[in-house]
A protein has these predicted regions:
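Active-site cores of enzymes that catalyze phosphoryl transfer or operate on phosphate-rich substrates
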Residues: 1-30, 109-175
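Short hydrophobic/aromatic-rich motifs at helix boundaries and adjacent loops
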Residues: 17-21, 47-50, 145-149, 176-180, ...
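PLD/PLD-like phosphodiesterase catalytic module centered on the HKD motif
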Residues: 54-123, 135-139, 165-350
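Glycine- and acidic
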Residues: 2-6, 27-34, 57-63, 85, ...
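Core mixed alpha/beta domains of very large multi-subunit molecular machines
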Residues: 1-54, 64-75
Length: 350
């Protein structure tokens, strides 16, 4: 069974514990990991150093050009190299932004795919999602991504993962095209997504095409959004809500109706040219039904948020739901739906 963590509602200490157990387990042979940003006193790196000292083969891909963290990452790289960890610095012209872990054991491998950095500080302030799986095709392809990082211009055919700059945009367009075709055939057709930014022209134009064909598109977009919803004949089937609340919304979740057999993806990539063309990013499918239900709950709560949500209307107004309030203020406030508070209470009670 797959496992998932939704930070900060779940503690990042659980992930640290996984790394620490891997570092001392006699069953574990190797650990591979991508690192983009690290905490000042990173427990992640300390666990990896412990693993190397215990004889595990540890490989770390670290991005030296992570904005504002260049000096920190250089220092951590030196410490890891001194401990016997094989450190890879990526490829000129491509930032390594994917969030991956591969743990090789004697009886099968485990991989982690995350939407956010393996950073204790971020995990207390950012909403991010991590899945852990032993699904063999995904495990093989995550391992192939590490090979791809070392030889990025070698052709690789990914079937499970969507990987940029390899084929992510092409595969996303194919998924949207399938929704258009299904709508034309009278089948279930919709797209639900939660991202930080949408600015990629090709994907925006494809979403317009899908909307014009009648595909329902519901988006939660926190930051930059070049897509204009609600334009008759173009985007009237697109609705966008943006949430600014206590935690920074950072997870990327994508759900496609697929004629009633929904397809779910999570990963590190926003729908921006830089993510699709100039970074190594990964979106991974999610097959576990319980995790799928959790992801759908997260996205749907995001659409419903009227307490901290704002309507992205294409006019640049970012109108807040139910504002201005009219008396009695307390009654209107009580009726508002706050997605982060709702998720917190539901996770707390499970």
């Amino acid at each position: 069974k797959d496992r998932s963590l939704h930070y900060p509602y779940h503690s990042f200490d659980t992930f640290i514990r996984v790394l620490r157990e891997a570092a001392i387990s006699k069953e574990v042979k190797s650990i591979k990991m991508t690192l983009y940003r690290l905490a000042k006193d990173s427990k992640v790196v300390k666990a990896l150093i412990c693993a190397a000292k215990n004889g595990k083969k540890v490989t770390v891909v670290i991005e030296l050009l992570a904005r504002f963290d260049e000096a920190s990452n250089i220092n951590w790289s030196k410490r890891m190299q001194d401990a016997g960890i094989r450190v890879i610095f990526g490829v000129e012209g491509l930032k390594i932004h994917s969030k991956l872990v591969h743990i090789g054991t004697r009886h099968g491998d485990i991989v982690c795919i995350s939407t956010g950095n393996f950073h204790e500080g971020n995990a207390r302030m950012y909403t991010d999602y991590t899945i852990m799986t032993t699904h063999r095709p995904i495990v093989r392809e995550v391992n192939a991504v590490f090979d791809f990082i070392e030889k990025p211009y070698t052709p690789v055919n990914f079937k499970e993962l969507l990987v940029s700059p390899n084929d992510m945009r092409k595969r996303l367009i194919a998924l949207i095209n399938k929704e258009i075709k299904n709508k034309e055939q009278g089948k279930d057709a919709y797209i639900l997504a939660k991202v930080n930014h949408i600015t990629d022209r090709a994907l925006i134009e494809k979403l317009y095409e899908a909307s014009a064909a009648g595909v329902k598109i519901e988006l939660v977009v926190r930051g930059n959004c070049s897509l204009v919803p609600g334009v008759p004949g173009v985007s009237e089937n697109i609705h966008i809500n943006g949430i600014i609340d206590r935690y920074l919304e950072h997870s990327r979740i994508f759900i496609f109706a697929n004629a009633g057999e929904e397809r779910y993806y999570i990963g590190s990539a926003d729908w921006m040219p830089r993510n699709l063309d100039n970074r190594i990013e990964v979106l991974a499918p999610v097959y576990d039904k319980e995790i799928q239900a959790d992801l759908k709950r997260i996205v749907c709560y995001g659409f419903q948020d009227t307490a901290k949500g704002r309507i992205v209307d294409g006019m640049g107004t970012n109108r807040i739901w139910n504002f201005p309030f009219t008396p009695p203020l307390s009654e209107e406030m009580a009726s508002l739906f706050r997605s982060q508070e709702k998720l917190y209470n539901e996770y707390k009670n499970t």
